[in-house]
Design a protein with these regions (language model features):
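Short functional hotspots at interaction and active-site rims
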Residues: 1-195
Length: 195
């Protein structure tokens, strides 16, 4: 838990949010975020015979970073996108306009964290233009965004895949996304307090 959650202003905002959570139909919620991936990811844990060290190979000095963006709904992962390189305001705006907005319906509630690139005027407008609302989570509250749970599993499976090129990361990402069942997505949303 972030120590900033103990600040009085953050506590108040989180308490208000907890009340708000119960007022929204989970079927209308769309949680957005991004996470990084690298071509040198490997498993963090594993098994080896007793007395032997577990060894896995990773490239050093020759790896690439990519950014994975997606939306979590109550029954699916929606609008997935993988960018070669880091995210910035322009790329996030392009993601919203090209991937997210076409997947939204009037009445949807898009929930984001407080990253600066999420608050751009063009981003907010693209979401509102389709009749959806945009709501920002309380500061220092990743625990209130269930897509963080999705990303934890996603990265674990990506590490297991051992993808070493951008194309391999892209292919592995598609295979991993196919593994998220509707009831699993609903469980993430419920576990974060929505429902």
């Amino acid at each position: 838990m972030a120590s900033e959650q103990d600040r009085p202003d953050v506590k108040r905002h989180r308490a208000r949010w907890r009340t708000y959570q119960g007022l929204i139909d989970p079927k209308r919620l769309v949680f957005i975020d991004e996470t990084w991936t690298k071509t040198n990811m490997t498993r963090l844990l594993g098994w080896a015979p007793k007395g032997e060290r577990l060894v896995d190979k990773v490239p050093h000095g020759h790896w690439k970073t990519a950014t994975f963006l997606a939306a979590l709904r109550n029954d699916r992962i929606d609008a997935p996108c993988l960018y070669d390189g880091p995210i910035n305001g322009e790329r996030f705006r392009a993601y919203v306009e090209q991937f997210l907005a076409p997947s939204l319906k009037p009445g949807d509630v898009v929930i984001l964290d407080n990253l600066g690139s999420h608050k751009g005027k063009a981003v907010r407008q693209a979401i509102r233009d389709v009749g959806a609302r945009i709501v920002f989570l309380p500061k220092y509250s990743p625990d209130l965004n269930p897509i963080e749970q999705v990303f934890a599993k996603f990265k674990t499976l990506l590490r297991k895949a051992g993808a070493r090129t951008y194309e391999a990361v892209s292919d592995a990402s598609a295979q991993i996304l196919a593994q998220y069942a509707p009831d699993e997505c609903a469980a993430y949303v419920t576990n974060a307090g929505y429902a």
